[in-house]
UniProtKB/Swiss-Prot annotation:
Family classification: Belongs to the small GTPase superfamily. Rab family.
Gene that produces this protein: rabC
SMART domains (alphabetical): RAB, RAN, RAS, RHO
Organism: Dictyostelium discoideum
Top-rank lineage group of the source organism: Eukaryota
Gene Ontology cellular-component terms listed: endomembrane system; lipid droplet; pathogen-containing vacuole; plasma membrane
Gene3D superfamilies, per database record: P-loop containing nucleotide triphosphate hydrolases (3.40.50.300)
Cellular localization per UniProt: Cell membrane
GO molecular function, one term: GTPase activity
Topology with respect to the bilayer: Lipid-anchor
Keyword Nucleotide-binding (UniProt): yes
Name this protein carries in UniProt: Ras-related protein RabC
Binding site for GTP: 13-20, 63-67, 121-124
GO biological process per UniProt: intracellular protein transport
Amino acid sequence: MEEEILYKIILVGESGVGKSSILVRFTDNTFSQHFAPTLGVDFNVKTIRNKETGQTVKLQLWDTAGQERFKSITQTFYRGSHGVIVVYDVTDPKSFERCKNWVEDINQYTQDGMIIILVGNKSDMVAQRKVTFEQGQEMAEQLKTKFLEVSAKENNGVTQVFDLLVQDIEATMKNSKVAQNQLNLNSEVGQKRGCC
């Protein structure tokens, strides 16, 4: 029986950018035009198969409120998380600019090397678009994150966000295990060199 892998993933961003829509599209493959704003934090679980390793991975998905009054709740959920998806609305430049603040918070409340993906949602709203794909890429480079655009409504790119996140988390975990094993080997060698 294979070992169960569990990753905690958090979705953050301003209110109304479509975090809940992305989550529900990914977990239930449905879309609703009208969502009540998330109050505090919402939680969901989805089991997927890693496309590279074939291993089963359980994702614990936390959808956080975008309102300022819930910010302290959101910060507590960063702890113990493996990855964060920062969502903005491509029709709302203010939500895009606030991504810098979200990433600063993530960096402040998590350990170094947190996997972060910047996601521009509502890419289907071409006529209302105010933030270009290139601006999203540029912001991601500045913030040192990965970047994707999605449409939760049309189910474009949503699964790719989670696939990319899982691949990056696993690569980071593998590298840290290699580093940890190297550390353990070095300490064993150091112990064996001692006298008597």
